[in-house]
Amino acid sequence: TTSVRTLESLYHIGATLLNNPEATEEDLHVHQWQPYEMSAKAATTPAVKALQAIVAYLDKHSMETLHTSTQIIIAPGYEYKIVKAMVTNFHQPQSTLLLLVSAFVHGDWQKIYNYALAHDFRFLSYGDSSLLIP
């Protein structure tokens, strides 16, 4: 799920660069609710264009590494831009990780978790995992 947040944050960094090519690294920080406040134009940016914008930014500034940060919250209503499948374990109820999963499977998390409970799957960090493909 950390990699999911990273990949989705990269999309939003690239979309920011497409809207503001002169952005500084500080401008590229992804705020908690930024994805939900995107303009319609930015929201329809293809993932490959967003990622290409990051590569172009690095090339333009002769950089090999981009230093920025993210506070992205992925919750129901979030539209995934890069991630098409996810391998994850079964998370604790009322956690932000469960919100991320719920957003990915469009609310079907209860059906998935009920199946896991009925079949004695193990939960949390050292438990069983699942491959989710919406």
Question: What are the language-model segments listed below?
Answer:
Residues 1-134:
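Surface-exposed, charge/polar-rich loops and edge strands
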